[in-house]
Amino acid sequence: MRNWRQAENIRLYIAVGCGAAIGALLRFLSGWVIVAILGANPLWGTSFVNIVGSFIIMFFATLTGPEGRWLVSPALRQFVMGGLCGGLTTFSSMSLDTFLLVLHGNAAFALAYLCGLVFLSLSAAMLGLIAAQRINR
């Protein structure tokens, strides 16, 4: 029994690690594309990945949760939610961006950026919930 649990834990670790690697690569590439399209301001890339990641994690969590239609393995659930979304989103970059704005004398903009990003990320999560609930019906 113990060996089975260890093997299952190893599967979860590998799933999270692979998902995180893909999520981090997607974060880097999407940031690069967003900056190329909208300009050199890194706030756009950070905002984009956090908003999209919030939608994805809530959408997937709702579809694969106890009331969800999709039955997936714990490894796949951790791959998407812990790995992919964890690697894609970036709280640390948001914190760095906010503090850099404050340090450069843009405290009001920093507050607006922080509040706006939290609001938009939570709104995206709500949209993910609503979309998945419609599929679950």
From Swiss-Prot:
Question: Which residues span the membrane?
Answer: 20-40, 43-63, 83-103, 110-130
| Family matches, as HAMAP family | FluC (MF_00454)
Q: State where Na(+) binds.
A: 86, 89
- GO CC annotations on file: plasma membrane
Function statement: Fluoride-specific ion channel. Important for reducing fluoride concentration in the cell, thus reducing its toxicity.
Q: Which reaction does it catalyse?
A: fluoride(in) = fluoride(out)
The membrane topology term of the UniProt record is: Multi-pass membrane protein
Q: Where in the cell is it found?
A: Cell inner membrane
Membrane as a keyword of this entry, yes or no, is yes
Q: Which UniProt keywords apply?
A: Cell inner membrane, Cell membrane, Ion channel, Ion transport, Membrane, Metal-binding, Sodium, Transmembrane, Transmembrane helix, Transport
* Predominant place of localization: membrane
Per its Swiss-Prot or TrEMBL record, what regulates the activity?
Na(+) is not transported, but it plays an essential structural role and its presence is essential for fluoride channel function.
Record GO terms (molecular function)? fluoride channel activity; metal ion binding
Q: Which cysteines are joined by disulfide bonds?
A: none
Family label? Belongs to the fluoride channel Fluc/FEX (TC 1.A.43) family.
The alphabetized list of GO BP terms reads: cellular detoxification of fluoride
Q: What is this protein called?
A: Fluoride-specific ion channel FluC 3
